[in-house]
């Protein structure tokens, strides 16, 4: 059946901001769907609130709405655009839930919009736990013993049936939010209450524990003629009990017998037929009891998922693209497989002759007090994928691609310490983020494969692979450097050992190992991911390295530019950097260069096989990048776009003769190295907060007496504010040195005078050596002291005077010329008492670039990439700053609900995972839209609680009167109440927790408040008020931890976020019109 002609326009629902459990894999699927549907001539309308996505670029869809993904707002878009159909399977749980709400509220019926890709009934049948259970029984498949509960009473009835331990999962949530494993009554009570609260339908599924069972996933695609293919089987290295998003996974499945595989394959197809998925991709999860082979079905997702992004990258089969085409009526046999250049149809199941390993990336160090053990609730923030010819090579490459400082199976424990074995046993039994390294330590300590299996339930086949790696390491150590013969070295490289790991084992420099490989002529060759195990020739240059015989890279002799990606997502380095890498590649491709992408993150658009001319799916480490450069010989390499990951390699690459284009590694160092930067600033006569660099605690104390408190303290060279703190007194400073950092001559600590209450400003600019053009000036809403990545911001500025802005423009220009920037530069300022202080300069792409590009319509990353390749700004027609005739506000999304026990106070350490954007004619409207996009819905009126720090007491009176005007009743804690009383406002007095009951927490728990403003400064005050913020979070009360955000919230009450919708294309037309005027 060819495509449908009865529909002309299709609305695609995006996934919104990046949160734990729902990351940039949906930008990848959404961007593919837009491309696929426009290719077929449909008009595509897209809604997604996340500006840091490729899919919201103005040329990806015909009409793009960066608006909150909420049914009332989407109804406005449907009313305006009148699409014929809506495709809800590309935007994760957010899109599914929104589509179901549109259906439930009659919006689809009202405007005659058809749901394609999945029916409301199929979504409901897969997501509603009790319906799913019945459906599985009807086709003879077993589910875990389970039942649903809507109250605590019902929950206890289910418990009687399943017993302890049991697994609790809320319905219609994502990434296991709110779920957990209960081993006793107390835990059961706590998890159930939390789950009932977090499920949109207030429903839980409680099932028998399958902890220790093996877990598998099948990625299935089905069309309406009932053709089904399995794209990929995935096996979880970690057994059941750990969320599959937090598990190490391997594809294809390694430990299934052929008979088991066929059983599972048939079961997956039966599931899709029964649920009624007619068009597109689904993922089906199974559990197998290793003791008796009993197989149960755990769940299925009737949409494109995190696993489908992984399966697409693992096989080269573009699931989202195919799913989008199936949704408009095509069948699999009518679609061509791009990778084999159309030699095979999409109805051929991919076959792969390599092993793929995915390892999740965690960020527990950012959440002091978080429970860092892995359970059924997802906690990882990103992932890395690696491809190898065998399991050991694949595993090794994934470990070094993670960028957690590992070069392979590095030792975690000092085996001579008395409690080494106790520590190892604990880490094996109670899995944390680092269990795989502890497994290697267990073998080093003499544990047997069975001993490790009994503690972990990880299949013995995987354990034997790790045991062998440990044995090989012992042999290398015993043989010493002289024992590295050509044969030994080649064998080690085939097993995936990195030069860095071998150098560690032998105690020589990494360059020594590289020299030896050159001498023996041992270099990696590149194999192609071709979907067909090399049975047909592949047109697509999608490569991975191995130490095999035949190289399939076949490089061309065109002019090439290589872009280094950012590796796995993590807090502080996320999708924004991938967005820049993709833009660099697209722009340079348009200009006729051959572009080469190097990256190892399976969720992203940059690792899509048709984003660049050639894709190398490899870890972004010095060894791997040098090997690719040796084969490809690029004219230039871009290191400034992937965040800190490629930037760290700049000097070493340059030293090895790799040509870095754009800002030179030396200039990058001048901005990053404190002392060299200081010299540049002094030469230009710019103002900086007083600061000092220290290498001992004594020095720090001495300097602090000169500079004065409060101080911002941090280690040098860091992204996302790791281990950064504001200290208020000497005792605090000493504690920081004892607890937070190891300070030394190699790693000094920086002290800066903290400008309390200053307004922070971010400026992105491009310099081509002749001129500097400002991309945008963003005024932060949270005051200085909150990490810029965690602060909301407005473009244009909403309170700063023209005079101050001009002062900053002038300084940016001077700095760009002084540092010799070629390409993008990000500068941060703080404004206090009409003085402009320079905080820092980053001569690279910053995380604000996508937001500025969407707000102004100027594609900064593309323009700057062309500058790096030698074009001037003038030749590109970008010569002056664009100030849009509307306001854009970026707001961040924080993951605190996943980490009970962590203080949600914003500070200098970055902890947000994603962002949304709101646009409006006024600042108030833009801010209101951004808040709605984050899901912060502020009720009209109610009761507000004010409890503020000393420094905020002057301004709190103004805030209180604004809240009264908006119809709020006021409560305040003692200090704040006294100030308000003096101003003639008499709030109700509430007790702090240690002042007797009923206290603040009691009132929060009784749902007395609709809004809480709490600011705190100083170690003790922050500690004392932590229970207040945790309470607000737990009871879902809106709260702000800065006064500026509270004032912005008051302003936003005057605007209606749902009143109007405007597409990006219309906004950019307004910009163009204002430029002509």
Curated annotation (Swiss-Prot):
<feature type="binding site">
    <location>
        <position position="299"/>
    </location>
    <ligand>
        <name>Mn(2+) 1</name>
    </ligand>
</feature>
<feature type="binding site">
    <location>
        <position position="842"/>
    </location>
    <ligand>
        <name>Mg(2+) 4</name>
    </ligand>
</feature>
<comment type="subunit">
    <text>Composed of two chains; the small (or glutamine) chain promotes the hydrolysis of glutamine to ammonia, which is used by the large (or ammonia) chain to synthesize carbamoyl phosphate. Tetramer of heterodimers (alpha,beta)4.</text>
</comment>
<feature type="binding site">
    <location>
        <position position="786"/>
    </location>
    <ligand>
        <name>ATP 2</name>
    </ligand>
</feature>
<feature type="binding site">
    <location>
        <position position="787"/>
    </location>
    <ligand>
        <name>ATP 2</name>
    </ligand>
</feature>
<feature type="binding site">
    <location>
        <position position="755"/>
    </location>
    <ligand>
        <name>ATP 2</name>
    </ligand>
</feature>
<feature type="binding site">
    <location>
        <position position="299"/>
    </location>
    <ligand>
        <name>Mg(2+) 2</name>
    </ligand>
</feature>
<keyword id="KW-0479">Metal-binding</keyword>
<feature type="binding site">
    <location>
        <position position="840"/>
    </location>
    <ligand>
        <name>Mg(2+) 3</name>
    </ligand>
</feature>
<feature type="binding site">
    <location>
        <position position="243"/>
    </location>
    <ligand>
        <name>ATP 1</name>
    </ligand>
</feature>
<keyword id="KW-0464">Manganese</keyword>
<feature type="binding site">
    <location>
        <position position="210"/>
    </location>
    <ligand>
        <name>ATP 1</name>
    </ligand>
</feature>
<dbReference type="InterPro" id="IPR033937">
    <property type="entry name" value="MGS_CPS_CarB"/>
</dbReference>
<feature type="binding site">
    <location>
        <position position="285"/>
    </location>
    <ligand>
        <name>Mn(2+) 1</name>
    </ligand>
</feature>
<feature type="domain" description="ATP-grasp 1">
    <location>
        <begin position="133"/>
        <end position="328"/>
    </location>
</feature>
<feature type="binding site">
    <location>
        <position position="760"/>
    </location>
    <ligand>
        <name>ATP 2</name>
    </ligand>
</feature>
<keyword id="KW-0547">Nucleotide-binding</keyword>
<keyword id="KW-0665">Pyrimidine biosynthesis</keyword>
<feature type="binding site">
    <location>
        <position position="842"/>
    </location>
    <ligand>
        <name>Mn(2+) 4</name>
    </ligand>
</feature>
<feature type="binding site">
    <location>
        <position position="285"/>
    </location>
    <ligand>
        <name>ATP 1</name>
    </ligand>
</feature>
<keyword id="KW-0677">Repeat</keyword>
<feature type="binding site">
    <location>
        <position position="241"/>
    </location>
    <ligand>
        <name>ATP 1</name>
    </ligand>
</feature>
<keyword id="KW-0067">ATP-binding</keyword>
<dbReference type="GO" id="GO:0006541">
    <property type="term" value="P:glutamine metabolic process"/>
</dbReference>
<feature type="binding site">
    <location>
        <position position="828"/>
    </location>
    <ligand>
        <name>Mn(2+) 3</name>
    </ligand>
</feature>
<feature type="binding site">
    <location>
        <position position="169"/>
    </location>
    <ligand>
        <name>ATP 1</name>
    </ligand>
</feature>
<feature type="binding site">
    <location>
        <position position="299"/>
    </location>
    <ligand>
        <name>ATP 1</name>
    </ligand>
</feature>
<dbReference type="InterPro" id="IPR011761">
    <property type="entry name" value="ATP-grasp"/>
</dbReference>
<feature type="domain" description="MGS-like">
    <location>
        <begin position="936"/>
        <end position="1077"/>
    </location>
</feature>
<feature type="binding site">
    <location>
        <position position="840"/>
    </location>
    <ligand>
        <name>Mg(2+) 4</name>
    </ligand>
</feature>
<keyword id="KW-0028">Amino-acid biosynthesis</keyword>
<dbReference type="GO" id="GO:0005737">
    <property type="term" value="C:cytoplasm"/>
</dbReference>
<dbReference type="GO" id="GO:0004087">
    <property type="term" value="F:carbamoyl-phosphate synthase (ammonia) activity"/>
</dbReference>
<feature type="binding site">
    <location>
        <position position="785"/>
    </location>
    <ligand>
        <name>ATP 2</name>
    </ligand>
</feature>
<keyword id="KW-0436">Ligase</keyword>
<dbReference type="InterPro" id="IPR006275">
    <property type="entry name" value="CarbamoylP_synth_lsu"/>
</dbReference>
<keyword id="KW-0460">Magnesium</keyword>
<feature type="binding site">
    <location>
        <position position="299"/>
    </location>
    <ligand>
        <name>Mg(2+) 1</name>
    </ligand>
</feature>
<dbReference type="Pfam" id="PF02142">
    <property type="entry name" value="MGS"/>
</dbReference>
<comment type="pathway">
    <text>Pyrimidine metabolism; UMP biosynthesis via de novo pathway; (S)-dihydroorotate from bicarbonate: step 1/3.</text>
</comment>
<dbReference type="InterPro" id="IPR011607">
    <property type="entry name" value="MGS-like_dom"/>
</dbReference>
<comment type="pathway">
    <text>Amino-acid biosynthesis; L-arginine biosynthesis; carbamoyl phosphate from bicarbonate: step 1/1.</text>
</comment>
């Amino acid at each position: 059946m060819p495509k449908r002609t009865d529909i002309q326009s299709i609305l695609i629902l995006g996934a919104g901001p990046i949160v734990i459990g729902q990351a940039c894999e949906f930008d990848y699927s959404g961007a593919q769907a837009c491309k696929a549907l426009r290719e077929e001539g449909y008009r595509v309308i897209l809604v997604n609130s996340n500006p840091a996505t490729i899919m919201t670029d103005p040329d990806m869809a015909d009409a793009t709405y960066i608006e909150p993904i909420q049914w009332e707002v989407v109804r406005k878009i449907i009313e305006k655009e009148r699409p014929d159909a809506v495709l809800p399977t590309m935007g994760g749980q957010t899109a599914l839930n929104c589509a179901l709400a549109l259906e439930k509220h009659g919006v689809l019926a009202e405007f005659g919009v058809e749901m394609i890709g999945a029916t409301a009934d199929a979504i409901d049948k897969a997501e509603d736990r009790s319906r799913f259970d019945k459906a599985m029984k009807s086709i003879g498949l077993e589910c875990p013993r389970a039942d649903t509960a809507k109250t605590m009473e019902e929950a206890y009835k289910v418990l009687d049936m399943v017993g302890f331990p049991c697994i609790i999962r809320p319905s219609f949530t994502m990434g296991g939010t709110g779920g957990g494993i209960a081993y006793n009554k107390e835990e059961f009570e706590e998890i159930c209450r939390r789950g009932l609260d977090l499920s949109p339908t207030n429903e839980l599924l409680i099932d028998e524990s399958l902890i220790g069972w093996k877990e598998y996933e099948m990625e299935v695609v089905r069309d309406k003629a009932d053709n089904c293919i399995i794209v990929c089987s995935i096996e979880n290295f970690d057994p059941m009990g750990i969320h599959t998003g937090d598990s190490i996974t391997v594809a294809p499945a390694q430990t299934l017998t052929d008979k088991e595989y066929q059983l599972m394959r048939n079961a997956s197809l039966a599931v899709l037929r029964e649920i009624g998925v007619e068009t597109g991709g689904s993922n089906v999860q199974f559990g197998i009891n290793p003791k008796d082979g009993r197989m149960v079905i755990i769940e299925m997702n009737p949409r494109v998922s995190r696993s489908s992004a992984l399966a697409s990258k693992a096989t080269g089969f573009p699931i989202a693209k195919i799913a989008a085409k199936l949704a408009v009526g095509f069948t699999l046999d009518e679609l061509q497989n791009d990778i084999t250049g159309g030699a095979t149809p999409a109805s051929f199941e991919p076959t792969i002759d390599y092993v793929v390993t995915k390892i999740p990336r965690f960020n527990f160090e950012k959440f002091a007090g978080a429970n860092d053990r892995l359970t059924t609730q997802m906690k990882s923030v990103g992932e890395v994928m690696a491809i190898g010819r065998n399991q050991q090579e694949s595993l090794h490459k994934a470990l070094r691609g993670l960028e957690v400082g590992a070069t392979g199976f590095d030792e975690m424990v000092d085996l001579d310490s008395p409690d080494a074995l106790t520590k190892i046993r604990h880490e094996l039994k109670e899995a944390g983020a680092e269990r795989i390294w502890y497994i290697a330590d267990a073998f080093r300590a003499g544990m047997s494969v069975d001993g490790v299996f009994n503690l972990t339930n990880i299949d013995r086949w995987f354990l034997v692979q790790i045991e062998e790696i440990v044995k090989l390491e012992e042999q290398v150590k015993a043989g010493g450097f002289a024992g590295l013969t050509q044969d030994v070295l080649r064998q080690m490289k085939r097993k995936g050992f990195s030069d860095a790991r071998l150098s560690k084992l032998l105690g020589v420099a990494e360059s020594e190992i590289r020299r030896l490989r050159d001498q023996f002529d041992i270099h990696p060759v590149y194999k192609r991911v071709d979907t067909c195990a090399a049975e047909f020739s592949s047109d697509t240059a999608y490569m991975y390295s191995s130490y095999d015989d035949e190289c399939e890279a076949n490089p061309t002799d065109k002019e090439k530019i290589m872009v280094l990606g950012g590796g796995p997502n993590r807090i502080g380095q996320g999708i924004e950097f991938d967005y820049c890498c993709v833009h660099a590649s697209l722009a340079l491709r348009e200009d006729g260069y051959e572009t080469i992408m190097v990256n190892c993150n399976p969720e992203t658009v940059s690792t899509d096989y048709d984003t660049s001319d050639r894709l190398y799916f490899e870890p972004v480490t010095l060894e791997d990048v040098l090997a690719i450069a040796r084969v490809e010989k690029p004219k230039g390499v871009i290191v400034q776009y992937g965040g800190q990951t490629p930037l760290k390699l700049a000097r070493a690459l340059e030293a090895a003769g790799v040509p870095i284009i754009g800002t030179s590694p030396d200039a990058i160092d001048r901005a990053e190295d404190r002392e060299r930067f200081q010299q540049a600033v002094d030469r230009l006569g710019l103002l900086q907060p007083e600061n000092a660099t220290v290498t001992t605690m004594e020095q720090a104390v001495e300097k602090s007496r000169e500079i004065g408190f409060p101080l911002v303290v941090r280690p040098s060279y860091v992204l996302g504010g790791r281990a950064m703190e504001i200290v208020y007194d000497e005792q605090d400073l000493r504690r920081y040195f004892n607890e937070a950092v190891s300070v030394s001559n190699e790693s000094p600590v920086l002290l800066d005078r903290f400008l309390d209450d200053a307004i922070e400003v971010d400026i992105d600019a491009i310099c081509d050596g002749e001129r500097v053009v400002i991309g945008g000036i963003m005024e932060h809403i949270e005051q200085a002291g909150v990490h810029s990545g965690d602060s909301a911001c407005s473009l244009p500025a909403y309170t700063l005077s023209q005079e101050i802005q001009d002062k900053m423009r002038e300084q940016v220009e001077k700095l760009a010329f002084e540092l010799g920037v070629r390409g993008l530069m990000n500068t941060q300022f703080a404004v206090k008492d009409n003085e402009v202080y320079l905080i820092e300069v980053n001569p690279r792409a910053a995380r604000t670039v996508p937001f500025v590009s969407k707000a102004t319509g100027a594609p900064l990353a593309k323009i700057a990439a062309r500058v790096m390749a030698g074009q001037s700004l003038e030749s590109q027609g970008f010569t002056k700053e664009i100030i849009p005739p509307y306001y854009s506000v970026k707001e961040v999304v924080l993951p605190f609900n996943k980490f009970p026990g962590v203080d949600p106070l914003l500070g200098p350490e970055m902890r947000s995972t994603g962002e949304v954007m709101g646009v409006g004619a006024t600042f108030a409207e833009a801010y209101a839209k951004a808040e709605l996009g984050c899901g912060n819905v502020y009720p009209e009126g109610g009761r507000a609680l004010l409890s503020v720090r000393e420094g905020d007491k002057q301004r709190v009176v103004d805030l209180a009167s604004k809240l009264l005007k908006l119809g709020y009743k006021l409560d305040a804690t003692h200090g704040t109440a006294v100030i308000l009383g003096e101003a003639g406002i008499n709030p109700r007095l509430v007790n702090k927790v240690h002042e007797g009951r009923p206290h603040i927490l009691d009132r929060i728990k009784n749902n007395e408040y609709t809004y809480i403003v709490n600011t705190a400064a100083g170690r003790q005050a922050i500690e004392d008020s932590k229970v207040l913020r945790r309470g607000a979070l737990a009871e879902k009360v809106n709260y702000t931890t800065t006064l500026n955000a509270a004032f912005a919230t008051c302003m936003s009450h005057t605007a209606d976020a749902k009143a109007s919708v405007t597409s990006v294309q219309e906004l950019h037309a307004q910009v163009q019109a204002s430029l002509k005027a």
